[in-house]
Regions:
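Glycine-rich FAD pyrophosphate-binding loop
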Residues: 21-41
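C-terminal catalytic lobe of FAD-dependent flavoproteins
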Residues: 164, 305-306, 330-332, 346-441
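Rossmann-like flavin
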Residues: 86-210
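Predominantly flavin-linked oxidoreductase catalytic cores and closely associated redox partners
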Residues: 151, 155-184, 191-280
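Active-site substrate-recognition segment that forms the wall
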Residues: 31, 43-51, 55-95, 180, ...
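N-terminal Rossmann-like FAD-binding beta1-loop-alpha1 element of flavoenzymes
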Residues: 2-28
Length: 441
């Protein structure tokens, strides 16, 4: 079967990898000149099952009010005259109840743990070098109230099999001595030994190279303008994709199935087909600094929970990423938010890096209100979704690619997860956590 994959980020490339391993002919269409040029380019580097608590949680509404008007707020809403943003925001608030948060954590952990194990298998098979660190992930807190608020989610994660252990200040410093300059401010933390970190760009480009060697066709600088459908009702299907190629010519690429892995841009492509996904872009920032003193720079990947920043050592670089700006599709850098990242990093590790050589970047995370991605089927028999992974695309990427390859091949993935458009085998709930609004054909 010929499968067209739309998008060559970590999710699309992993989908292509597993589809070719399942015996399919695969062609990947990507508008950028290479793989991992957008959201997968310079993220925080964490493969973090322990980061399963969604942004939408019981403490989020009050935090949003507290952050209102702050240009450097960890989560910044810029309200626009745009119905999708308002509808997304209302659904986000609806997901902030304790019951919805607990359900969403279960789903996120299921796909994240499946993906972590899948990544380990791919790494063993391919030997891709991507500055991998398997030292775990450390969350630390500098606010006692926020630390106490984190405990129920951490306890639930432990109950679900994620070994996220609550620790005291002394243990935080023992695990990562580089935090010693702020020891007096740390009130506690938690540590997950099985989490990892690494450079998603290096991994994705390495995997894309091995995909190409295995027979996958990549067409870069290729814009998909629309998907062509035929039939109605149960017989509706996609017969191809209209593109503008690297020479500016219009073409039609035909295939037997299509996998949409275009992140935040999936929404616009699918809307004319009557598939309205609840995905909105969340602009995330990162800063990358050259390390100048190995003894003072951290080795363990960390999350600074109070500032919503993740910190990963990538060889001789330190990557610090985070914050979220709900403000449409602009990737323009806000100097205030960039400076806030560097200011906090200097507070933590004052002499570890050359902060004058900061490389700033912003990418659009495809956010669903619940943080649960769309992985599965649509009303079109041969159109599949692998999108909406939010802040956890690197964490969920390999597992999502493996799962969608199973679904395209007509098989049920071996994990208990709310796959889109598919019946659940175990966990059920009266409420759908991510609404998919579909118009009748």
């Amino acid at each position: 079967m010929k499968v067209i994959v739309l998008g060559a980020g970590i999710v699309g490339t992993a989908s292509a990898w597993f589809l070719q391993k399942a015996g399919h002919e695969v062609i990947v269409l990507e508008r950028q000149p290479g793989a991992a040029q957008e959201t997968s380019f310079a993220n925080g580097g964490q493969i973090s099952v322990s980061h399963a608590e969604p942004w939408a949680n019981p403490s989020a509404p009050l935090k949003l009010l507290k952050w209102l008007g702050r240009e450097d707020a960890p989560l910044l809403f810029r309200l626009r005259p745009e119905w999708l943003q308002w509808r997304w925001g209302m659904e986000f608030l609806r997901q902030c109840t304790p019951g919805n948060t607990a359900y969403n954590i279960r789903q996120i952990i299921a796909i994240a743990e499946y993906s972590r194990q899948t990544l380990q298998s791919v790494r063993a098979e391919t030997n891709i070098e991507y500055d991998c660190e398997t030292r775990g992930i450390l969350h630390f807190y500098t606010d006692q109230k926020e630390f106490q608020q984190s405990l129920p989610a951490a306890n639930l994660m432990r109950d679900l099999g994620c070994p996220r252990q609550t620790i005291n200040t002394n243990e935080v410093i023992r695990i990562e001595p580089a935090l010693a300059p702020i020891r007096h401010k740390i009130v506690g933390g938690d540590f997950t030994t099985t989490d990892e970190s690494g450079d998603v760009y290096k991994f994705t480009t390495g995997l894309a190279s091995q995909c190409a060697e295995a027979g996958v066709t990549f067409r870069f600088n290729t814009f998909v303008t629309r998907l062509i459908s035929e039939g109605t009702g149960a017989s509706a299907r996609i017969v191809g994709a209209e593109i503008i190629d690297e020479h500016g010519k219009h073409q039609t690429i035909r295939g037997d199935s299509v996998v949409v892995a275009m992140g935040s841009f999936s929404t616009h492509l699918l809307k004319p087909l009557g598939i309205n996904l609840m995905i909105y872009p969340g602009k995330g920032y990162s800063a990358t600094y050259p390390v100048i003193d190995n003894a003072l720079a951290p080795r363990v990947s960390m999350t600074d929970d109070g500032h919503k920043l993740v910190i990963s050592r990538l060889g001789d670089r330190l990557r610090v990423a985070g914050t979220c700006e709900i403000n449409g599709y602009s990737r323009a850098l806000n100097p205030v938010r960039c400076e806030a990242i560097t200011r906090r990093t200097q507070e933590l590790f004052p002499d570890a890096c050359d902060y004058n050589q900061a490389q700033y970047w912003a990418g659009l995370r495809p956010l669903t209100p619940s943080n649960i991605p769309y992985i599965g089927k649509t009303k079109y028999s041969n159109l599949f979704l692998n999108t909406g992974h939010g802040t956890l695309g690197w964490t969920m990427g390999c597992g999502s690619g493996r799962a969608i390859a199973e679904i395209v091949s007509g098989r049920q993935p071996e994990l208990d997860f709310a796959f889109t458009g598919m019946a659940r085998t175990s966990v059920t709930r009266a409420m759908i956590s991510i609404p998919v609004h579909v118009k009748n054909s």
